[in-house]
Amino acid sequence: LERLVRRLRQSSGQTLIAKKDDFERLTAVMASGGKVATLADQDAGPRGVFVPFFGRPASTHKAVALMALEFDALIVVLGVPRIPRHQGRFASATPANQEICYAVEIEDVIEPREYAGHTDPVGQITQRYTAALERLIRRHPEQYFWVHRRWKHQPRSSHLRQAA
């Protein structure tokens, strides 16, 4: 499955960055004015920031918020759900020759400058994009492909109160 997904992503011109060397490469892309897309629903381990996700504290990567703040980059939270063929541009096509249709749904656009002077901008931004992701999933739960343990790491009791 991983090889198939990698091949599909690379065939559209995307450069994939491995988790182990991501920070240096992501920093280079951002510093050069590039754009970065990330899967925001991954468990970040015990060092992540814990924010509510479907009512439970979830360890979430800080890098999205940190890089947005450092490079003054917008965070665009979006989903690409499949839509019925009759709603796509090929509405008059027959089922045999229709392409698969998708919609692009922008759920939130987060401006990091809005968080200047806040006591915990990383936590607040992380919570906001996680809430936006949750709304996208709730609209199309049948299309969400969950193959990992999102709540694998749980916070110590002091973090539980912060995430609730």
Residue ranges and their predicted role:
Residues 20-164:
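Non-catalytic C-terminal accessory region of glycerolipid acyltransferases
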Residues 1-20:
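Membrane-interfacial amphipathic helices and adjacent loop/beta segments
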